Each structure stands twice: as C-alpha cells, then as structure tokens.
A protein has these predicted regions:
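A short, amphipathic beta-strand motif
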Residues: 2-11, 21-23, 62, 91
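Short, ordered, surface-exposed loop/turn motifs in non-cytosolic proteins
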Residues: 12-38
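A short, solvent-exposed beta-strand micro-motif common in secreted/extracellular proteins
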Residues: 21, 45, 59-70, 128
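Short, surface-exposed beta-strand/beta-hairpin micro-motifs centered on an aromatic residue
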Residues: 43-46, 50-57
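Short strand-edge motifs at loop-to-beta-strand transitions and within beta-strands
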Residues: 51-55, 77, 87-89
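Surface-exposed loops/turns
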Residues: 58-59, 83
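Extracellular beta-sheet/turn segments enriched in Thr/Pro/Gly and aliphatic residues
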Residues: 79-102
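Catalytic cores of extracellular degradative/oxidative enzymes
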Residues: 102-202
Length: 202
C-alpha cells in the first residue's frame, strides 16, 4: 500500500516543529499513522505529529490540513496518490506574527484530562508543543467521584514536560458552587491557583 510521508518545518527557521495534522482520504474518512494520538474535544478531528508522519494511503485525492498554534496560518494541500510510489510532502509553515518578540507569550492555564484519558503523559507532552504554548498549566480538580487523569500530577513545575521554550506546571482549580448537588449552578465561577506548593483542600 502506498504511503503519505510528511515533514513539518517552520519556514523561517527551518526547524522541524510539532503540529496538528488532518488527512482526508478519497472516501471522506480520516486517516492517520497507526499509533497516532488524536485531538480530544469538539471541532475537526486531527492527529498530533512530532514534526514527521507516515501513513498508509489509498489511490486518489487526499486533502491535508496542518495547524500549529495561533501564529501560523493553516497549511492546506490536496495531493493525488496514484499507487505507483509513496508521496513525500515538505510542509512549510509561515509564521504571520512573532508575538514573543513583542513580549507576548501564548499560554493555557485551564486544562484537564478526564477519566477517559489513557495516556496523559503523552498528551501533555504534545499539547504545549503542538499549540506552540510558552506556558501550560493542568489543574487538579475534584468533581463528583471522577478520576481526572491530570489529578495525578503534583502541584508545581512539571520538569519532565518543561524545557527552555515550554513551561509546564500543575495547579489547582477551585470552584464556587452554590449547590454541590447541582453541577449546573456554578456560582461565581472558577479560580485557577498557580505556583502553589501543596494542594489546597476545601
């Protein structure tokens, strides 16, 4: 079976970068590497790529969409797989803005992985890189008896996921619920506690 192989680069630096990838086959289905990790949540389905990917493809036209954070326009292309050889794609992502150079750094401080997440370490390693986030925080959350996968991380900096360009930490979400028995009455909302040394119990 022929393959589609791609490598994703920042067009300015030439660096191989992680991104979200969607490949639509001729029959309209989504195809991905056999060991791919899929995005969770609403919206279009994507799989996560560490900058390189290879997947089995059928003959015909395939639509490819690659996204990375908010500072890169989506990259799109339709290619034809004729079955005679593998298709190799060089994906160059053009950065439309360099906000960190202006002192603005993207981040997400409100992330939970629910009890259905089977590989939180792998997902957390992807999340900050694929979305090009300088700062990422998962939060401990007590909600009913749900075993949130991200509750396993201790408060503070998560060194195994942090590097020079990505700060990843675990904090805590505290909720003001008017009626704990009614999840739809959330009172004044949520407060995210960051840079804490210990979990704060109600």
């Amino acid at each position: 079976m022929p393959k589609i192989t791609g490598e994703i680069h920042d067009a300015m630096t030439g660096e191989v970068v992680q991104a979200r990838v969607q490949v639509i086959s001729p029959d309209g289905g989504n195809v991905a590497p056999t060991d791919a990790m899929w995005k969770v949540g609403p919206g279009e389905p994507f799989f996560y790529s560490n900058g390189q990917f290879s997947l089995d493809a059928s003959r015909g036209y395939h639509r490819i969409l690659v996204e990375r954070g908010t500072e890169y326009p989506p990259w799109q292309k339709t290619i034809e797989v004729d079955g005679s050889s593998d298709s190799v794609i060089d994906i160059q992502l053009d950065r439309w803005a360099d906000l960190p150079d202006r002192g603005w750094h993207p981040g997400n401080t409100h992330i939970h992985y629910d009890e259905k997440e089977k590989d939180p370490d792998r997902r957390l390693a992807y999340d900050s890189r694929v979305e090009d986030l300088r700062m990422t925080a998962v939060s401990i959350l007590k909600r009913w008896d749900l075993d949130y996968a991200t509750n396993k991380y201790p408060p503070g900096v998560l060194n195994e996921f942090t590097d020079t360009h990505h700060h990843v930490q675990s904090g805590e979400e505290t909720r003001h619920n008017q009626d704990p028995s009614n999840p739809f009455q959330i009172g004044y909302g949520h407060v995210m506690l960051l840079n804490i040394r210990n979990q704060v119990d109600p």
